[in-house]
Curated annotation (Swiss-Prot):
Oligomer and partners: Homotrimer; non-covalently linked.
Record has Transferase as a keyword: no
Keywords: Calcium, Disulfide bond, Glycoprotein, Lectin, Phospholipase A2 inhibitor, Secreted, Signal
Sugar-bearing residue positions: 61, 122
Family, similarity comment: Belongs to the alpha-type phospholipase A2 inhibitor family.
Domain C-type lectin: 46-161
Gene Ontology CC terms: extracellular region
Protein's recorded name: Phospholipase A2 inhibitor
Length: 166
């Protein structure tokens, strides 16, 4: 949308630089100004709609991160590729409310899903006896949001994490 606005400004600049020989009444200039104003209004509406959805989603799950599933069942490497192609990430809850939002998706689908735990994580939600490196190098969350060590070859629910930078 910003590209369209910039294009409109560029056309307006070119028109002004070339003079008014081809548009002595200013109709073309007025038309460009009207089109630019229309694009600005549309951009403001889209931005407002986006922010409304963002705020509603954040309010609804208590997290500014959005956890979404495509309902596929895949292993860790396939999940990584799917999330990357979708513009998201493998879930990595950093706070309790983020883990709860993630767990809500798992509970709704009655499935487990992979997550990534950073080395410097301030928040963890390991189940009793975990982490258990013997169980595998990956981590999964159960439907209650508890974390368990698991094999990276297990086929689990595909859930990707998306977050907004405002």
């Amino acid at each position: 949308m910003r590209l369209i606005l910039l294009s409109g400004l560029l056309l307006l600049g070119i028109f002004l630089a070339n003079g008014h020989e081809q548009d002595p009444d200013g109709k073309l200039l007025n038309s460009l100004i009207d089109a630019l104003m229309h694009l600005q209004r549309e951009f403001a509406k889209l931005r407002g709609a986006f922010l409304t959805v963002y705020k509603a989603r954040s309010f609804g799950n208590g997290s500014e991160r959005l956890y979404v599933t495509n309902k596929e069942i895949k292993n860790f490497e396939a999940l990584r590729q799917i999330c990357e192609q979708a513009g998201g990430h493998i879930p990595s809850p950093q706070l309790e409310n983020q883990n709860k939002a993630f767990a809500n998706v798992l509970e709704r689908h009655n499935k487990e899903a992979y997550l990534v735990v950073g080395d410097s994580a301030n928040f963890t939600n390991w189940a009793a006896g975990e982490p258990n490196k013997a169980a595998g190098a990956c981590v999964k969350a159960d439907t209650h949001g508890s974390w368990h060590s698991t094999s990276c070859d297990d086929n689990l629910l595909v859930v990707c994490e998306f977050y907004f930078i405002l």
